[in-house]
Amino acid sequence: KKGKAVQLRGISSHGINWDVGEPFVNEKALQNLRDEWGVNCFRVAMYTEDYNGYCVTDTASRKKLLAKIDTAVKAGRKLGMYVIIDWHILSDGNPKKNQSKAKAFFKKMSNKYRKEKHVFYEICNEPNGGVQWKTIKSYAKSVIKGIRKADKNAVVIVGTPTWSQDVDMAAKSP
């Protein structure tokens, strides 16, 4: 931040797709997390397929998900907090399954939030089901290309195989 290292201290929503998450994605909730728990980063976990996920839901529900993301981004800006927009895969396991939707989603998000330096993009959380790093890496290059067109300095987080446990694979072949 302004040339200085930042230590992120954060918490993740459990999935903005669930109605039970509604009370927790708003300015008051984020302010409480910041003031009472010392949180400076909020991860907006949006499932892609599970729980009426972004890739499988109807247009009206998709608009609600985008509105929740926007609420978190605006609250984060006002409160001086970082916000991670998380493409949360679970049963889909392999991020390539919804690659075209991910590319369109992150193109939209990175264009909308390109001036919001407190916004980070997590383009595939916890790949699983035996997907290999080379597959994730190929997916990541494709999605990141679109993000970089909007914001060449955006922070992008890429999950690794086995629910993001195999970080050594990414370290060996970034």
Task: Describe each model-derived feature in a short phrase.
Residues 30-113, 117-119, 123-129:
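Substrate-binding cleft and catalytic face of glycoside hydrolase catalytic domains
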Residues 15, 22, 82, 99-120, ...:
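Extracellular glycoside hydrolase catalytic/binding regions
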Residues 1-43, 56-59:
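N-terminal carbohydrate-binding accessory modules
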